[in-house]
């Protein structure tokens, strides 16, 4: 299966971190031929691990054979990319967070036009999309993950920062 991810990969924005981790995990699956289309360039300011950058650069350097096409194109960016995939057989999946009580009006129509499926990180966003008119069968909730090496319950609690909790 050929999967392409379109989005940012090289900064520390929340969408970028998710894209980067999805790409790194999918790249380890022998049943997936992964390609990425970065919408950003690497900058050392992000402080990314050199091994991660090398892996992403190696993936982004790959080109899809002229006779092939992505089976699935995952789009995770803001604003969303509203365009047809390069091949009509490619299924387009949007990953789309949202933080407000209503989606932009045009998104419902554009998702119906361009998306084969939409993934959102919470039931709250799913409910907003469904209330906005999106077919409930075309949307799935997949919560954002966390890195248990960074957020480890066994680590000692953080030291207080000298903030008076009675004031807040």
State where each predicted segment sits.
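Nucleotide donor/acceptor-binding cores
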Residues: 1, 90, 166-168
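N-terminal subdomain of nucleotide-sugar transferases
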Residues: 1-43
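Helix-loop-beta element that forms the nucleotide-linked donor phosphate-binding surface
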Residues: 126-146, 153-154
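Structural alpha-beta junctions
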Residues: 26-35, 115-117, 123, 135-138
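Acidic anion/phosphate-binding donor-loop and adjacent secondary structure
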Residues: 105-107, 145-168
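Extended catalytic core of nucleotide-activated donor transferases of GT-like folds
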Residues: 4, 43-130
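Conserved donor-binding loops in enzymes that form glycosidic bonds
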Residues: 8-9, 97-98, 144
């Amino acid at each position: 299966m050929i999967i392409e991810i379109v989005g940012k990969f090289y900064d520390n924005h929340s969408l970028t971190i998710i894209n980067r981790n999805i790409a790194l995990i999918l790249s380890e699956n022998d049943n997936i031929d992964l390609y990425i289309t970065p919408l950003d360039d690497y900058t050392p300011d992000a402080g990314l691990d050199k091994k991660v950058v090398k892996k992403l650069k190696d993936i982004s350097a790959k080109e899809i054979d002229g006779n092939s096409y992505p089976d699935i194109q995952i789009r995770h960016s803001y604003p969303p990319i509203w365009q047809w995939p390069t091949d009509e057989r490619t299924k387009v999946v949007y990953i789309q967070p949202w933080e407000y009580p209503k989606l932009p009006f045009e998104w419902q129509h554009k998702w119906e036009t361009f998306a084969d499926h939409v993934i959102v990180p919470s039931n709250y966003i799913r409910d907003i999309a469904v209330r906005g008119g999106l077919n409930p069968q075309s949307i799935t909730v997949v919560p954002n993950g966390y890195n248990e090496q960074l957020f480890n319950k066994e680590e000692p609690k953080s030291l207080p920062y000298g903030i008076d909790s009675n004031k807040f």
